[in-house]
From Swiss-Prot:
Keyword annotations of the record: Cytoplasm, Magnesium, Metal-binding, Nucleotidyltransferase, RNA-binding, Transferase
Signal sequence segment: none
Pfam families named in the record: KH_1, PNPase, RNase_PH, RNase_PH_C, S1
Source domain of life: Bacteria
Location(s), subcellular: Cytoplasm
Major location category of this protein: cytoplasm
Cofactor(s) named in the record: Mg(2+)
Gene Ontology MF annotations: 3'-5'-RNA exonuclease activity; magnesium ion binding; polyribonucleotide nucleotidyltransferase activity; RNA binding
Catalytic activity: RNA(n+1) + phosphate = RNA(n) + a ribonucleoside 5'-diphosphate
The name this protein goes by in its record: Polyribonucleotide nucleotidyltransferase
Enzyme class, broadest EC rank: transferase
Domain KH: 561-620
Residues given in the record as Mg(2+) binding sites: 495, 501
Length: 722
């Protein structure tokens, strides 16, 4: 029976646009069609598929927006098979976590207040050109997928990477170009406003950083235009959702119960006392408006109104020119305390306290073997500098679960690392690997910037010759209509209730890291300029205090390893390592040193003990010394050859030579064992070395030389020799 063959037809829509020197293609309608929105982004052989799914119903009792973003790298994208026993991708790498956050941050504030449906964004890297980072395509793809999903999303957004070299900005620099760039900045925003900035730089002026943000925002308009065209052509069915109407009567009730109490609470300068007073105000609201018959949705609505009232009061006080929550004006940095070398056995340590935020930061020096190996999709590499940030629950006076680092901890650690990388000494001047760990012991805002300050101080404590001191500060913003206030060194409450979180780190010469998250649209270039200049003022103040506490690098700790560098002939590396690593293991075990050997013959010996290092150096020198023909050596007979050909004599570690039977004595001998025994110490002369490195030794040659010397002496004195 014949059947007509059916052909599956895809409603495929494609948009292509020029993005600087790169051509970007957006495709939808062929892959992942059951998702709310799905877009495949292609940029010079880098291909990322991004899907968006919006939940149709809200979970009972849901009182927050449950957005999840996962960026996933598949090893097949780079033509690789995963390592390890299971041969499949496992938990997210640090790069995957950081890129997930990069996508999340500019998208989250564009969903409307009160929208509590589940939204999941999954970005999967399908193909990777090592020169084109997949993060910008993933961000553009997420924006495009949301734009065609029908979800209530106030986008689209665009994203761009900006480099800076020879006084010019570079749009979407390649991996190779970034190696010589003075800046690596990622900016995201809508057609009207910037929403997010993430960057590191090599001590660049504030004006250059601001110019990069503006340049990136201008250039990303090409992506926004293409996404809008794609959405128009797709013409998605809009999500059936409307913002809940405000209950003005309920708002008035809550204001009447808690308004004055909250206003008084936010005049209390100490965080814990303020928290108690806010909780008392909330208890009064609960007692008056919530009972056993109140359903969860109504309870959540009441709680939301209470939180909005908190924000309204704090923001109003600041814009009215009143003192901030802790009594400061808008430009003052909280009191700072610095203690260095606080831990006796660590290589370097510092306790940095700014108001109610405190970081105990520890630096550890290691060797080449301690470097972090990164098995990246674009290729394996190592990092000599690591910074890890820990945020335990006790830092905010809470009890909670301890476990592996969360996304926030990884992100904060990365920001602090970006801030310090620019001032690290080059490897050829300071051969150590370095690990900094920031333990946040108290937190009330800006703990990542405390980690920058403490990290710098701990590295100086460890003796690391930094190019300059680095300090960091977090800025905030309150914006209502045409009125705004930029806040220096924000508290945790000011971060939650404000419109911007703007973190700047750098030296006295310029910016080394900048991170900005904006929760509203309408932040102008002028506001960003004011924030940057005010941040510089605060940063210079902190740098002055840091320099007073620790002027420069201190001496290496007695507990830190010392590095000794020597050079050998690269052809001798095999001899130092030995068969199966036997020789090098023996040296490290006997001397207690760590030894690293480079391909060019550079050997680095790391040891806390100078005696151990000298012993290791001597062993290596003995192994690598060249045998000289004509030179006399004292050696040990290690073997009498079975065929009576001669004996093997060890003259240097790893250097054996043959004494042929004819080279043992002047007279003809029948048995080698009549003259030599294993373990016997003899003097030999190196008489020949062939092209394979085999050494021929002679005892006879020395006997002949001794005879000639004796004859010459006798002749000089007129004596007869027998």
């Amino acid at each position: 029976m014949n059947q007509d063959r059916e052909t599956l037809v895809f409603n495929k829509i494609t948009k292509t646009f020029q993005f600087g020197r790169q051509t970007v293609t957006l495709e939808t309608g062929e892959i992942a069609r059951q998702a709310s929105g799905s877009v495949v982004v292609s940029v010079d052989d880098t291909v990322v598929m991004v899907s968006v799914v919006g939940g149709k119903n809200v979970k009972p009792g849901q009182d927050f927006f449950p957005l999840t973003v996962d960026y996933l790298e598949r090893t097949y994208a780079a033509g690789k098979i995963p390592g390890g026993f299971f041969k499949r991708e496992g938990k997210q790498s640090e790069k995957e976590v950081l890129t997930s956050r990069l996508i999340d941050r500019p998208i989250r504030p564009l969903f409307p207040e009160g929208f509590y449906h589940d939204v999941q964004i999954v970005a999967t890297v399908l193909s990777l050109n090592p020169e084109v980072d997949s993060d910008i395509p993933a961000m553009i793809g997420a924006s495009a997928a949301l734009a065609i999903s029908g979800l209530p999303f106030a986008g689209p957004i665009g994203a761009a990477r900006v480099g800076y070299a020879n006084g010019e900005y570079i749009l979407n620099p390649t991996k190779t170009e970034l190696q010589t760039s003075q800046m690596d900045l990622v900016v995201a925003g809508t057609s009207r406003a910037v929403l997010m900035v993430e960057s590191e730089a090599k001590e660049l002026p504030e004006a250059v950083m601001l110019g990069a943000v503006v340049f990136g925002h201008e250039q990303m308009q090409a992506a926004i235009k293409a996404i809008n065209e794609l959405a128009d052509e797709v013409n998605p069915v809009m999500f059936d959702w409307a913002a809940p109407a405000k209950d003005e009567a309920l708002i008035a009730q809550i204001r009447g119960i808690a308004g004055e109490k909250l206003a008084e609470a936010f005049r209390l300068r100490q965080k814990q006392a303020r928290t108690v007073a806010i909780n008392e105000a909330w208890d009064a609201v609960k007692a008056g408006l919530i009972n056993e018959e109140t359903d969860t949705l109504k309870a959540n609505e009441i709680k939301g109104i209470f939180k909005s009232l908190e924000a309204e009061i704090v923001r109003g006080q600041i814009l009215a020119g009143e003192a901030r929550i802790d009594g400061r004006d808008t430009r003052t940095v909280r009191p700072i305390s610095i203690r260095n070398n606080v831990l006796p056995r660590t290589h370097g340590s510092a306790l940095f306290t700014r108001g109610e935020t405190q970081a105990l930061v520890v630096a550890t020096l290691g060797t080449k073997q301690d470097e972090q190996i990164i098995d990246a999709l674009a290729g394996e590499y190592t990092e000599r500098f690591m910074l890890h940030y820990n945020f335990p629950p006790y830092s905010t006076g809470e009890a909670g679960r301890m476990g592996p680092p969360k996304r926030r901890e990884i992100g904060h650690g990365r920001l602090a690392k970006r801030a310090l990388v620019a001032v690290l000494p080059p490897e050829d001047e300071f051969g150590y690997s370095m690990r900094v760990v920031s333990e946040i012991t108290e937190s009330n805002g800006s703990s990542s910037m405390a980690s920058v300050c403490g990290g710098c101080l701990s590295l100086l404590s460890a003796g690391v010759p930094l190019k300059a001191h680095v300090a960091g500060i977090a800025m905030g913003l309150i914006l209502e209509g045409n009125r705004f206030a930029v806040l220096t060194d924000i508290l945790g409450d000011e971060d939650h209730l404000g419109d911007m979180d703007f973190k700047v780190a750098g030296t006295a010469a310029g910016v080394t890291a900048l991170q900005m998250d904006i929760k509203i649209q309408g932040i102008t270039k002028e506001i960003m300029q004011v924030a940057l200049e005010q941040a510089k003022e605060g940063r210079l103040h902190i740098l002055g205090l840091m320099k007073e506490a620790v002027d420069g690098p201190q001496e290496l700790s007695a507990h830190a390893p010392r590095l000794y560098v020597m050079k050998i002939n690269p052809e001798k590396i095999r001899e130092v390592i030995g068969k199966g690593g036997e020789t090098i293991r023996s040296i490290t075990k006997d001397t207690g040193c760590e030894i690293n050997i480079e391909e060019d013959g550079t050997i680095t010996i790391a040891s806390v003990s100078s005696e151990g290092a000298e012993a290791a150096k001597k062993r290596i020198e003995e192994i690598t010394v060249e045998v000289e023909v004509g030179k006399v050596y004292e050696g040990t007979v290690v073997k009498i050859l079975d065929n009576n050909v001669g004996a093997i004599v060890s003259i240097l570690p790893g250097k054996d030579g043959l004494v042929h039977i004819s080279q043992i004595a002047n007279e003809r001998i029948k048995n080698v064992s009549d003259y030599l025994k294993e373990g016997q110490v003899v003097k030999v002369k190196a008489i020949e070395m062939d092209d394979r490195g085999r050494i021929r030794l002679s005892i006879k040659a020395l006997l002949e030389e001794e005879a000639k010397t004796a004859q010459a002496t006798a002749d000089a004195f007129g004596l007869k020799t027998q």
